[in-house]
């Protein structure tokens, strides 16, 4: 599928299966989300640009590769996106963090924005937007639009699960933003949930209903 990368690493697939199980506890779900987010982050940052730097090892001076340019920005779509942040920040502790408060109205399924806070110089940074679920795509579309309004030009979207409907909507709205996901499920049900899915990621992560 054009513009969509499915990360099919065996560890990702295994952990995702356990997360799908309805009997997986809140603590277990949260731990697995942290673990899988680290693996997903590894893949979404695979092609970051490098530059050479002169360093001194205990034995000699050498030219060695380091990341080029300004630090990354991880943009979390609240609240469930925060579940992906912890593992990603363990891998890239120097990353800046943006928070985009968007929730889906359960009656209209439309996105409602309520909060936005982001680092400066978004135009000079790679921004990786994170949300466990790409369902209708409305929240993600709105979040990316807000980031673009604030200057972001180089954006990637990372999620755990995606529905074909959400992918279609997102790609139509933001064809310049590639999607990275651990799996593409069958469809959305009448309530806008991904099927077979894993339920509401935020509720399962925080033990709420």
UniProtKB/Swiss-Prot annotation:
Keyword Metal-binding: no
Sequence positions that bind 5-phospho-alpha-D-ribose 1-diphosphate: 79, 104, 131-139, 200
Pathway annotation: Pyrimidine metabolism; UMP biosynthesis via salvage pathway; UMP from uracil: step 1/1
GO MF terms held by the record: GTP binding; magnesium ion binding; uracil phosphoribosyltransferase activity
Domain of life: Bacteria
Cited CDD domains: PRTases_typeI
GO BP term (any one): UMP salvage
Disulphide bridges: none
Family affiliation: Belongs to the UPRTase family.
UniProt-listed PANTHER family: ADENINE PHOSPHORIBOSYLTRANSFERASE, URACIL PHOSPHORIBOSYLTRANSFERASE, CHLOROPLASTIC
Identification of the protein by name: Uracil phosphoribosyltransferase
Organism expressing this protein natively: Agrobacterium fabrum (strain C58 / ATCC 33970)
Gene: upp
């Amino acid at each position: 599928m054009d513009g969509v990368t499915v990360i099919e690493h065996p560890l990702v697939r295994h952990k995702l299966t356990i997360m799908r199980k309805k009997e997986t506890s809140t603590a277990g779900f949260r731990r697995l989300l942290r673990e899988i987010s680290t693996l997903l982050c590894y893949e979404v940052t695979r092609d970051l640009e490098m530059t050479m730097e002169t360093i001194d090892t205990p034995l000699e001076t050498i030219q060695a590769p380091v990341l080029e340019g300004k630090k990354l920005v991880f943009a979390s779509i609240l609240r469930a996106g925060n579940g992906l942040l912890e593992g990603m920040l363990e891998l890239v502790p120097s990353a800046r963090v943006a928070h985009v408060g968007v929730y889906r109205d359960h009656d209209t399924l439309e996105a409602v924005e309520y909060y936005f806070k982001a680092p400066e110089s978004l135009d000079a940074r790679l921004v990786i937007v994170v949300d466990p679920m790409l369902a209708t795509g409305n929240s993600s579309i709105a979040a990316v639009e807000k980031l673009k309004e604030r200057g972001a030009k180089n954006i990637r979207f990372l999620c755990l699960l995606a529905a074909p409907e959400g992918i279609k909507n997102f790609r139509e709205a933001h064809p310049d933003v590639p999607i990275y996901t651990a799996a593409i499920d069958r469809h959305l049900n009448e309530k806008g949930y991904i099927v077979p899915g894993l339920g509401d990621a935020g509720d399962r992560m925080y033990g709420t209903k």
